[in-house]
Design a protein with these regions (language model features):
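Short linear sequence elements within intrinsically disordered, low-complexity coil regions
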Residues: 10-16, 27, 151, 162, ...
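Non-catalytic connector elements of ABC transporters
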Residues: 161, 170-282
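Short, small-residue-biased leader/transition segments that mark boundaries at the very start
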Residues: 1-2
Length: 282
């Protein structure tokens, strides 16, 4: 196994080629094989024309690729990366994420990456493990962990979520009804629980739709007032307050420049589909 920490730890007195070759030289790899492996790795990370440059002459993203090449050229069975992109700015980090995944997949090495950046984990991982107090709480594909969290902690830890408490009042194979002071939740599947069981409904902000008109549904809808809003370009985040004092967060994608204009203090309806929720034990 090879471990690469947050620091690139490139040797400042060695050029790119010699940095990548360093481990092979120490292992006594024959020169012809070493040259071939280093050249192949520099081609893979697209740094052939920078082979004679010193580390200080490279950008942060290029230094990151040199450090990765130095690790991969030794052909480890397992590579562990600790916050590998933490030193890069946001835009470069996003660009490098895709490059890094492609390089690792081409080499065919198993990679374990430690990160506190959830966007980074979602983008790069085939499987994500959520840990708390030394225990694995859920392991699965990024979409599985995000869309179907198996407990309240995972739902709250991964991404943004509205956690709403209620009581199971109807449970059939094709649907369930959860009653709360907020509204009646109609879930599009059974949950195999006993009636009266306290549960928590997990509802992601992007699953909520907003309307200035009553949507005319007896469930999965609640009257709200806009407490605050934040414009992020591609979407707008709304903090809503219900008549019962419950706070909801909703994200609305700005697909149309001429969509309904919603302002602070305005009254509206929040509503969502029956398949938008995940029911968790409380």
């Amino acid at each position: 196994m090879l471990f690469r920490s947050q620091s690139y730890a490139l040797f400042p007195h060695l050029n790119v080629w010699d940095n990548v070759a360093f481990g092979l030289k120490r292992d006594g790899v024959p020169k012809a094989e070493m040259v071939e492996r280093v050249e192949d790795m520099l081609a893979l990370v697209q740094l052939q024309k920078f082979a004679k440059r010193s580390p200080h002459q490279l950008s942060g993203g290029q230094q990151q690729r040199v450090a990765l090449a130095r690790s991969l050229v030794k052909r480890p069975q397992l590579l562990m990366l600790d916050e590998p992109l933490g030193a890069l700015d946001k835009k470069l980090r996003e660009e490098t994420q895709v490059e890094l995944v492609n390089i690792i997949k081409q080499v065919g090495v198993t990679c374990v990456m430690v990160t506190h950046d959830q966007d980074e984990a979602m983008t790069m991982a085939d499987r994500i493990a959520v840990m708390s107090e030394g225990r694995f709480l859920q392991v699965g594909a990024p979409s599985e962990v995000y869309e179907y969290p198996n407990c309240r902690f995972v739902a709250d830890f991964v991404g943004n979520v509205n956690l709403l408490d209620g009581e199971l009042t109807e449970d059939e194979p094709d649907h369930a009804v959860i009653t709360s002071p907020l509204c009646r939740f109609h879930v599009g599947h059974g949950i195999s629980g006993h009636l009266g069981m306290p549960v928590t409904v997990a509802l992601r902000p992007e699953k909520i739709s907003l309307s200035l008109q009553d949507p005319g549904q007896s469930h999965n809808a609640v009257a709200c007032r806009v407490e605050s809003l934040s414009y992020f370009g591609s979407y707008t985040s709304y903090h809503l307050k219900t008549l019962h004092g419950q706070t909801l967060q909703a994200w609305v994608t700005n697909t149309d420049r001429h969509h309904e204009h919603i302002e602070m203090g305005q009254s509206l309806w929040a509503h969502w589909q029956s398949n938008a929720m995940v029911v968790l034990d409380r």
